[in-house]
């Protein structure tokens, strides 16, 4: 990163921006891979902003670090957990994924679990719905991805 978490937080002071903002953090890949990300999140939360972090939910060490933030900050944090069901199942990471989702929920964060649908999941729909209901008490959301780099926003 070109700037420290503290510098970024200083630039994003809510007084400079006219009040608290909703800030979405989405990486070009897994958002939480950089080891510094929890500190960027922390510093922005300290400014009084609301953050939404898009993540695949698999980096337990990052969630462990974030879980140590004060609850009043965590209540301003929402995770959009991308639910890559087939890949998580193939790697045997479904338990890890749901454990991280529940950990953040128990610490006071808001969340969504969002399945990216594709034809290869048709036979698994009932299993996916039942798994989410069993683990989280509700079915996951469906998010249709679009290629924003194309004029027609292809699926």
Language model feature labels by segment:
Residues 1-3, 18-33, 45-62, 72-97, ...:
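Core AdoMet radical
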Residues 12-17, 41-46, 66-76, 98-107, ...:
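Acidic (Asp/Glu)-rich catalytic clusters
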